[in-house]
Amino acid sequence: MAIELGLSRITKLLEHLGNPQNSLRVLHIAGTNGKGSVCTYLSSVLQQKSYQIGKFTTPHLVHVTDSITINNKPIPLERYQNIRLQLEALNKSHSLKCTEFELLTCTAFKYFYDVQCQWCVIEVGLGGRLDATNVIPGANKACCGITKISLDHESFLGNTLSEISKEKAGIITEGVPFTVIDGTNEASVINVVKERCKALGSELSVTDSQLNGNMIDTNSWGCFDLAKLPLNGEYQIFNLRVAMGMLDYLQMNELIDITKNEVSTRLAKVDWPGRLYRMDYRFDKVSNRTVPILMDGAHNGSAAVELVKYLRKEYGNQPLTFVMAVTHGKNLEPLLQPLLRPIDQVILTRFNNVEGMPWIHATDPEEIKDFILTQGYTKEIVIENDLHQVLPSLAHVSDEQRRPIVVCGSLYLCGELLRIHNSHLRN
């Protein structure tokens, strides 16, 4: 199975399943970067004792079940397998030829329907207009959010920001009452979304594009001081503004009833590995030795630029060690050019096959090395194909001599390293 955009296959499969998506109350998120963060903010704030808040985000970080959660708890493996067996049988018996992502999306919808979730926070997989998640009727979407849009997946979405924006804005369908877009987007992007909203009668809110002293102003709760929240990276402020714009709309229209203190308390507890995530990485099963790392799933040009802003703020001009793997087919220049300097070291590796995504594989480290040398980014390059050996080799360097270690380039790399780390904790 590979990536095949379109709604015809999943529409037929869901019909055979009884159309569970038509009973869900949804918040739908599209964009290039920041979608997962917005989803995490939304699901965290919406959680109440009596509420079931479903969240569907991809790709998964450690296990495929991580993609489908209720109140941040992954779908039980047995439940996941039972729904998948049902879907695969329908897919085969009706010769639908659904993709892996379409099957995963249907699994989420069926689970959320069975559990009777009060809200479902749904992240677009790729693009928006023809993404499997867009099978949800517009009338079921309480509001939509669009994060920062930049060049990525050009072979599927188009080669210009305007083309890509039209695909992302496709989640705004007939019946969607309200949409929030990140105000730091290019004017051309915002204009595309404005035109889409105007054509379909969806009210549009453009978030503040300035930092403004790390404040977020809302109609429902007044101002929030973000200095009191654990937000790494200024771009997370802009992601949070999208989420807060959506929550503000829900509160103003009496679709939720949450106090300002509850919002602040829940935001303060938000945590997600793989996004500017600091950890002491345990690299073997026997000793308790660890090595400190910063892990970030930056995998395209705009994400790399934001990561660099954070690194310069934290480390100044200090030399860094990057541990990197890149998904095959990615444009290397936008990712590597902002990150690498002649004073930096790069350890190139590869991730293994990704569960549930057989079309995903890593770029050959030798290919990345040749590109880095040709571009003259740095000459300090090491290739280590065995992920189990990458971080132990750095752990033997003394604390005084060890450079800060940054793992980036792919969420699949982050996920596999976390699996190794977790397996060592269990042993």
Curated annotation (Swiss-Prot):
GO biological process entries: folic acid-containing compound biosynthetic process; one-carbon metabolic process
EC number(s) reported in the record: 6.3.2.12
A GO cellular component entry from the record: cytosol
Keyword Nucleotide-binding included in the entry's annotation: yes
Reaction catalyzed: 7,8-dihydropteroate + L-glutamate + ATP = 7,8-dihydrofolate + ADP + phosphate + H(+)
SUPFAM superfamilies: MurD-like peptide ligases, catalytic domain (SSF53623), MurD-like peptide ligases, peptide-binding domain (SSF53244)
One GO MF term: metal ion binding
Cellular location(s): Cytoplasm
UniProtKB keywords: ATP-binding, Cytoplasm, Ligase, Magnesium, Metal-binding, Nucleotide-binding, One-carbon metabolism
Binding positions (Mg(2+) 2): H153
Organism domain of life: Eukaryota
Binding site for ATP: G34, K35, G36, S37, R275, D296
Signal among keywords: no
Gene3D superfamilies xrefs: Mur ligase, C-terminal domain, Mur-like, catalytic domain
Family, similarity comment: Belongs to the folylpolyglutamate synthase family.
Role: Glutamate-adding enzyme which catalyzes the binding of the first glutamyl side chain to dihydropteroate. Leads to the de nove synthesis of tetrahydrofolate.
PANTHER family in the record: DIHYDROFOLATE SYNTHETASE-RELATED (PTHR11136:SF0), FOLYLPOLYGLUTAMATE SYNTHASE-RELATED (PTHR11136)
Other observations noted: Present with 2340 molecules/cell in log phase SD medium.
Protein name from the UniProt record: Dihydrofolate synthetase
Taxonomic source organism: Saccharomyces cerevisiae (strain ATCC 204508 / S288c)
Gene: FOL3
